[in-house]
């Protein structure tokens, strides 16, 4: 392999693409003493920006509810990055974008969620680390109709 054909990966820019926070039952919700049920959803999307430049967006949605229908808060962060990815075989490009890039973006999204929730008057939410490789394998297995155990 020549020097020009070496795989190349670099971070060009990391930014918040979208951030929303809803506290629909304020101020009465602050009087509640029950511990809310927390739900976390993740979604990763990748798009081509230019030749060798890709935008990856990791969307983290965290909702807190009391009982089945009383919303405490809903926060959604779309943490994005522009990555330069060159000389990577086509079969390896998707795993880089769906595993490697989200691993880089997740700490930024986690901090944005925690900051938004605490600024809304609640205890900060600390999201647990995510195994993006296992999520990717699960999604691939679902596409192919197979089963993969998540560890």
Curated annotation (Swiss-Prot):
GO terms for molecular function: unfolded protein binding. Keywords: Chaperone, Cytoplasm, Protein transport, Translocation, Transport. Transmembrane segments: none annotated. It is found in: Cytoplasm. One of its GO terms (biological process) is protein transport. GO terms for cellular component: cytoplasm. Belongs to the SecB family. One of the proteins required for the normal export of preproteins out of the cell cytoplasm. It is a molecular chaperone that binds to a subset of precursor proteins, maintaining them in a translocation-competent state. It also specifically binds to its receptor SecA. Homotetramer, a dimer of dimers. One homotetramer interacts with 1 SecA dimer. This is Protein-export protein SecB. It comes from Azoarcus sp. (strain BH72). The gene is secB.
